[in-house]
Amino acid sequence: MDDDAQMVAIDKDQLARMRGEYGPEKDGCGDLDFDWLDDGWLTLLRRWLNDAQRAGVSEPNAMVLATVADGKPVTRSVLCKILDESGVAFFTSYTSAKGEQLAVTPYASATFPWYQLGRQAHVQGPVSKVSTEEIFTYWSMRPRGAQLGAWASQQSRPVGSRAQLDNQLAEVTRRFADQDQIPVPPGWGGYRIAPEIVEFWQGRENRMHNRIRVANGRLERLQP
């Protein structure tokens, strides 16, 4: 560890004391209540996503995705690319670690952590693959570099060095140099979480946060 790293090291007491303060001034709204969901969970989730974008939250559509591997939870951040009445969807390689886990246990949860606004939204439910049409529609919207990256990377597999990874990208870049349209790689697509439970969380003073859960068409307020 260099001198600069030692100067900014956080000791155990500092870590224990770290906490943010929450209140109406953080998100500029009143207390989350049942009437916020009069138009359903999807309307509120879209509204909160739009609020995060307007507030300048970095990657407001990022969500922490949890899957199960051999009975053990595994999490990572992914980007929500479809949000509709059917649920939330993301795209990946079907042979990635999460793809293999979902093949065994097709159930997942995802949390949108909008810390800057003192809000979170949580979705959980069964998972299924998105349609071929949805795959092609989203693929056509991806930047060319991201398309090439999907071809170059054997997602979640070990790689010997950064140089090897760069060489793989260079190879597929040459391969598709004369093609205006890059095809969808085999084994690449998307998954959709169909919400069984949706929870909205809003931070408030003294840790007395607001939590409202939508499950089986019922609204419930949960203790923080």
UniProtKB/Swiss-Prot annotation:
Pfam families: PNP_phzG_C, PNPOx_N. It catalyses: pyridoxine 5'-phosphate + O2 = pyridoxal 5'-phosphate + H2O2. Disulfide bonds: none annotated. Substrate binds at R19, G20, E21, Y22, K81, Y138, R142, R207, M208, H209. GO terms for biological process: pyridoxal phosphate biosynthetic process; pyridoxine biosynthetic process. Catalyzes the oxidation of pyridoxine 5'-phosphate (PNP) into pyridoxal 5'-phosphate (PLP). Unlike many PNPOx enzymes, Rv2607 does not recognize pyridoxamine 5'-phosphate (PMP) as a substrate. HAMAP family: PdxH. This is Pyridoxine 5'-phosphate oxidase. It comes from Mycobacterium tuberculosis (strain ATCC 25618 / H37Rv).
